[in-house]
């Protein structure tokens, strides 16, 4: 079983309440969003992986926001391209 001390993670994020929010958000991304962990898995659960990523400075709230915005922009661009292709096919 992995042992994680959250003190380092709290120091990276600022307070324990924000840490819970960021770690939960990242763990959810790994569980349901198909995102790969940025640290070796070592048979850990996603919550432990999220805390380890935060401790190592690989993830914080700003990083998650930027990544989500980029993914949303990529998805919107792909959708626009698909709609354009459909519209051009009807001409």
From Swiss-Prot:
GO molecular function list: DNA binding; DNA-directed RNA polymerase activity
One Gene Ontology term from the biological process aspect of the record: DNA-templated transcription
Family matches, as InterPro entries: DNA-dir_RNA_pol_omega (IPR003716), Pol_omega/Rpo6/RPB6 (IPR006110), RPB6/omega-like_sf (IPR036161)
Reaction(s) the record says it catalyses: RNA(n) + a ribonucleoside 5'-triphosphate = RNA(n+1) + diphosphate
Residues passing through the membrane, by range: none
EC number: 2.7.7.6
The organism's place on the tree of life at top rank: Bacteria
UniProt keywords, alphabetically: DNA-directed RNA polymerase, Nucleotidyltransferase, Transcription, Transferase
GO cellular component: DNA-directed RNA polymerase complex
Gene3D superfamilies per the UniProt record, alphabetical: 3.90.940.10
EC class of the enzyme, as a word: transferase
Keyword Transferase: yes
Function comment: Promotes RNA polymerase assembly. Latches the N- and C-terminal regions of the beta' subunit thereby facilitating its interaction with the beta and alpha subunits.
NCBIfam families for this protein: rpoZ
Family: Belongs to the RNA polymerase subunit omega family.
Name the record gives this protein: DNA-directed RNA polymerase subunit omega
